[in-house]
Amino acid sequence: MKSVITTTISAADAAGRYPSTSDLQSVQGNIQRAAARLEAAEKLGSNHEAVVKEAGDACFSKYGYNKNPGEAGENQEKINKCYRDIDHYMRLINYTLVVGGTGPLDEWGIAGAREVYRTLNLPSAAYIAAFVFTRDRLCIPRDMSAQAGVEFCTALDYLINSLS
């Protein structure tokens, strides 16, 4: 799984060198942000049901046509699958926060996602709207500390940009 640490070591090893000072500074910065990432992961993990429900509700509110016949949310089973997918991505955001790198999202969430959505007639814009809602809904300090919020929003932005 890719993280700042594994990426740094892999790059140094591929070049047949020791990690440079800037490599080590990058790793040190990553480690210093670890407490904030873990706080964000803990808050997301303990509130994931509400986060997923609110994100899904926002998605269907903005894209109500998805409940029309022939669309991604035409029946309760398909609606439940949309909420399940949002939950899956939130879990990957959680893993990304714990790992400190985008590996979980890259390996398990983003690779091929656009192709799958297009093939299954699932609008990625609706999922993106759910993640944008989650990012924009975040309230500091009610939900988490400022630095934890930065880490959480950074992970969400990475996902949003990758699916766009």
From Swiss-Prot:
Contains two covalently linked phycoerythrobilin chromophores. In PubMed:8876649 the authors refer to the bilins as phycoerythrobilins. In the PDB entries, the bilins are named as phycocyanobilins although the modeled compounds correspond to phycoerythrobilins. (2R,3E)-phycoerythrobilin 1 binds at K81, C82, R84, H88. It holds the Pfam family Phycobilisome. Coiled coil: none annotated. The keyword RNA-binding does not apply. Light-harvesting photosynthetic tetrapyrrole chromophore-protein from the phycobiliprotein complex. Heterododecamer of 6 alpha and 6 beta chains. The basic functional unit of phycobiliproteins is a ring-shaped hexamer formed from two back-to-back trimers contacting via the alpha chain subunits. The trimers are composed of alpha/beta subunit heterodimers arranged around a three-fold axis of symmetry. The phycoerythrins also contain a gamma subunit which is located in the center of the hexamer. This is R-phycoerythrin alpha chain.
